């Protein structure tokens, strides 16, 4: 959820706000291609790599904005820790093979005092990955609700900012 805040919501809204519906649709098409075939396998190596690299370029700014929005949301959300969100965001935002994936994860992990990511299985193969955040406590089901609230608040902040910009330019 923390990673998908950027590519699932923040980035599409930014692309629609700047480039209109065509921009939002273009962004989602590239993002979906990356999700579906962006893996480096023999069948889709050239097309998949192109989709993955284009997705990296398109998400470069939105991922960083998402990390900042999630951090700001952590300052506003009762029970979340904005100071720790900022600390972990700055420390761990580059702990991922993708240049963009860890920004939101780091802010969310810090806000909720969680450790996210780590080793993962893909197509039956274990991939060693770094952890994001500190292992302050066990993850509990309520953390899903807290992460959702953090995401919704970050999205709400973005909407307010975009509406203020829209009102100012009209």
Please name every model-derived segment.
Residues 1-30, 35-170:
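Hydrophobic alpha-helical transmembrane segments
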């Amino acid at each position: 959820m923390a990673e998908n805040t950027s590519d699932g919501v923040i980035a599409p809204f930014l692309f629609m706000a700047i480039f209109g519906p065509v921009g939002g649709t273009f962004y989602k098409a590239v993002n979906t291609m990356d999700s579906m075939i962006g893996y480096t396998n023999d069948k889709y190596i050239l097309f998949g790599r192109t989709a993955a690299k284009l997705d990296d370029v398109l998400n470069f700014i939105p991922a960083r904005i998402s990390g900042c929005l999630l951090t700001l949301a952590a300052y506003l959300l009762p029970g979340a820790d904005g100071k720790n969100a900022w600390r972990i965001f700055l420390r761990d935002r580059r702990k991922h093979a993708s240049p963009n994936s860890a920004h939101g994860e780091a802010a969310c992990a810090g806000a909720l005092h969680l450790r996210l990511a780590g080793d993962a299985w893909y197509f039956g193969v274990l991939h060693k990955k770094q952890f994001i955040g500190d292992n302050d406590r066990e993850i509990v089901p309520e953390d899903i609700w807290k992460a959702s609230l953090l995401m919704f608040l970050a999205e709400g902040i973005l909407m307010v900012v975009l509406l203020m910009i829209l009102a100012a330019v009209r």
